[in-house]
């Protein structure tokens, strides 16, 4: 990637809006910028990151900066979890009147005993100095602030985080 492309991606990724009310946000640019910013981390593991956004996906009602923080945390965690030459898949599509974003990886999975605690503040499975244990707590809070929900499904060899967000009202009319 050229330097100008990386700078552009970082600017898009760090878009910390100061909006006081939720507004229509397109999901695809935020996901694309997040993946561009994390591309070098993926390269270090020879990991592949794929993205598949449904054509004509409506905008969601939310806060762009917060949504980008959500994508950054989920995709970064997925890259931490995958083995060498692992795979992280990101999809976004419309389901049941909402936009659903999935971040899936082929890492070892999250044991059930740990899964119950992953959204707890200060809970981490990472080595000392490698994480604060706040990432998924913050993700859950930001998703709630954007009127969304998050679920995790994990088994050995696969973990999926599923984020549902409301479609912007004017996007609903445009469909």
Question: Can you describe what each PLM-predicted range is?
Answer:
Residues 98, 110-122:
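Short conserved segment of the HATPase_c
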Residues 135, 139:
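Short alpha-helical Gxxx[C/S/T] motif in the catalytic ATP-binding
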Residues 85-97:
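Short beta-strand/loop element within the Bergerat-fold HATPase_c
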Residues 142-144:
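Detector for a conserved hydrophobic position within an alpha-helical segment of the HATPase_c
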Residues 105:
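Acidic ATP/Mg2+-coordinating residue in the GHKL
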Residues 147-148:
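Conserved glycine-rich
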Residues 48-58, 95-96:
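Conserved catalytic submotifs in the C-terminal HATPase_c
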Residues 77-79:
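Short helix-loop "hinge" at the ATP-lid/N-box region of the Bergerat-fold HATPase_c
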